[in-house]
């Protein structure tokens, strides 16, 4: 597919047939190999291959490993369908199936009750997003009489503003669920109960990016809805800040990385909110590699422990036992922190700068929020490195007795290390070549050459300064008492408790009332019970009349 794109140097559409034809509504079945699809399909293919190679060793002792490889391969097929489809309906098929496969992979270790609960939570929250996607599809078919990207792009300028705002809101809600934005984000942390290769592929590099991909693919709608773009901006800003605050007090190594994924997805959402779609996709492109590497490095640490603990407080001193894993996590963390010279610096900081370069009140405020988030990213990245690899061992001797590196897991990690270092240097070629199909938005060029140096360097300076303070705290001031703020963040701002107490419990109570007073009450009286009693009553009346006539 990449070869076709480079040969023709323009979008290539492969028409496979007509799927649905009802009057003037024609829904095609085909593939669209444009710049956007080709940019996203590259990390999907490379990381899927690396994860499958990594899983050979990681899952080598699992009796159900063949089923795992089959499900993971099927996921790659449907993720590809989601990306290269030429219409929203085909995209929705891929969207649905990656959600179902995510459920199967999170619950892969089905004997763990926590894994089953987490999988159920993940699929239910994702189904909420799917519902909004279905409604958006219905509106497109009703008003556009089409769901293919080209037709929608051509007709959108003539559509009603209210309809476009409604479509933008529905697609945003769908993306909020899939890309774990604030409000529908709880499933991503719970998804860490699945095997680590699943986290590296689905919950870092591919599936969770589907929401961002849908928003970028829907740029032709969003560009006519400035109100929705502002909402998207603020949603991304709040999510990136909240996820960073929660991450600095989280002790589960995979959950910290999941929260960093949530934060980086929010940076992409921020870019979409200022119409910098090319920057959003480029950050998605780069982020996939170093985030998959982070998960693989964490998996190497977890796999080497006898009890496979994920609590960083039980680690310590592992740099002596796992030097390669330390190097891999260090490179990925520095890239995540946007240290100059590494991939993350070239894709992440330009988005933060562009917020300031938008020259709007919201842009200025969100710039400082994003700077705060970038600072928190540096803090929790360093915290992972310190608690895991530095200091003294915190587990018992037996846990350290069999720790070793695995060559089978190292080889795919080496590939991702190379990408995490060097892929950032391709920014100009990716933005200049791949983004041809996106709206003409050259704001980042003005940002690059007009902003003062301190605006550009502020995230880096704050991140390094507060990281140094964090090292001092861990070394010399570790007896600081836990505060109410710590407990608030450690409980993930009590989101799950609020959701359970206000939404879930009241919904169940409403369901109970509906069952008692409608299903078992009104409907039962008018339905089965009422009919039964009526028949019995009629039979009695008939018998009485017959007896009366007989005696007469």
UniProtKB/Swiss-Prot annotation:
Biological process, per Gene Ontology: electron transport coupled proton transport; mitochondrial electron transport, NADH to ubiquinone
Domain of life: Eukaryota
Entry GO terms, CC: mitochondrial inner membrane; respiratory chain complex I
Claim: Transport is one of the keywords in the record: yes
Role according to the record: Core subunit of the mitochondrial membrane respiratory chain NADH dehydrogenase (Complex I) that is believed to belong to the minimal assembly required for catalysis. Complex I functions in the transfer of electrons from NADH to the respiratory chain. The immediate electron acceptor for the enzyme is believed to be ubiquinone.
Catalytic activity, reaction form: a ubiquinone + NADH + 5 H(+)(in) = a ubiquinol + NAD(+) + 4 H(+)(out)
Residues that span the membrane, as ranges: 11-31, 36-56, 68-88, 89-109, 121-141, 152-172, 196-216, 229-249, 256-274, 287-307, 322-342, 365-386, 406-426, 453-473, 532-552
Location relative to the cell: Mitochondrion inner membrane
Membrane topology designation: Multi-pass membrane protein
Keywords: Electron transport, Membrane, Mitochondrion, Mitochondrion inner membrane, NAD, Respiratory chain, Translocase, Transmembrane, Transmembrane helix, Transport, Ubiquinone
Name this polypeptide is given: NADH-ubiquinone oxidoreductase chain 5
GO MF annotations in UniProt: NADH dehydrogenase (ubiquinone) activity
Entry EC no(s): 7.1.1.2
Disulfide topology: none
Family: Belongs to the complex I subunit 5 family.
């Amino acid at each position: 597919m990449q070869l076709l794109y480079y040969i023709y140097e323009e979008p290539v559409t492969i028409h496979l047939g007509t799927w649905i034809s009802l009057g003037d509504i024609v829904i095609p079945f085909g593939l669209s190999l444009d710049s956007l699809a080709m940019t996203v399909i590259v990390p999907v293919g490379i990381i899927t291959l690396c994860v499958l190679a990594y899983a050979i060793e990681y899952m080598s002792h699992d009796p159900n490993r063949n089923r795992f490889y089959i499900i993971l391969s099927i996921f790659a097929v449907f993720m590809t369908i989601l990306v290269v489809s030429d219409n929203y309906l085909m995209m929705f098929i891929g969207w649905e199936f990656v959600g179902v496969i995510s459920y199967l992979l999170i619950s892969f270790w089905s004997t763990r009750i926590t894994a089953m609960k987490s999988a159920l939570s993940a699929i239910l929250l994702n189904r909420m997003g799917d519902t909004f996607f279905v409604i958006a599809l219905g509106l497109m078919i009703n008003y556009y009489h089409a769901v293919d990207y080209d037709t929608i792009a051509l007709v959108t300028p003539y559509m009603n503003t209210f309809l476009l705002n409604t479509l933008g809101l529905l697609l945003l809600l769908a993306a909020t669920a899939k890309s774990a934005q604030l409000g529908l984000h709880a499933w991503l942390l719970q998804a860490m109960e699945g095997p680590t290769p699943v986290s590296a592929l689905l919950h870092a590099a591919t599936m969770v990016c589907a929401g961002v991909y849908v928003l970028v693919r829907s740029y032709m709608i969003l560009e006519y809805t400035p109100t929705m773009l502002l909402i998207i901006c603020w949603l991304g800003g709040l999510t990136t800040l909240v996820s960073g605050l929660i991450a600095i007090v989280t002790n589960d190594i995979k959950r910290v990385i999941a929260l960093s994924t949530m934060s980086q997805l929010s940076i992409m959402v921020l870019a979409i909110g200022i119409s910098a779609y090319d920057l959003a996709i480029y950050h998605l492109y780069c982020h996939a590699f170093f985030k998959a590497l982070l998960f693989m490095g964490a998996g190497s640490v977890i796999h080497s422990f006898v009890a496979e603990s994920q609590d960083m407080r039980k680690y310590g001193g592992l740099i002596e036992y796992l030097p390669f894993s330390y190097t891999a996590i260090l490179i990925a963390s520095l890239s995540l922190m946007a240290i100059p010279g590494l991939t993350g610096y070239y894709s992440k900081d330009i988005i933060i700068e562009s917020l300031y370069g938008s020259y709007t009140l919201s842009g200025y405020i969100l710039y400082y929020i994003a700077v705060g988030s970038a600072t928190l990213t540096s803090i929790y990245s360093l915290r992972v490195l310190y608690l895991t690899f530095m200091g003294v061992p915190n587990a018992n001797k037996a846990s350290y007795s069999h720790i070793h590196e695995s060559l089978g897991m190292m080889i795919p990690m080496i590939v991702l290390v190379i990408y995490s270092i060097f892929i950032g240097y391709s920014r100009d070629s990716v933005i200049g070549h791949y983004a041809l199909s996106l709206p003409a938005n050259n704001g980042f060029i003005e940002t690059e050459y007009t902003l003062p140096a301190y605006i550009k360097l502020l995230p880096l300076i704050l991140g390094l300064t507060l990281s140094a303070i964090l090292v001092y705290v861990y070394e010399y001031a570790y007896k600081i008492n836990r505060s109410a703020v710590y407990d608030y963040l450690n409980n993930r701002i009590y989101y799950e408790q609020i959701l359970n107490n206000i939404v879930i419990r009241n919904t169940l109570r409403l369901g109970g009332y509906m069952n008692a007073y409608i299903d078992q009450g009104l409907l039962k009286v008018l339905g089965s019970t009422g009919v039964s009693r009526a028949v019995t009553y009629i039979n009695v009346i008939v018998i009485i009349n017959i007896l009366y006539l007989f005696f007469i």
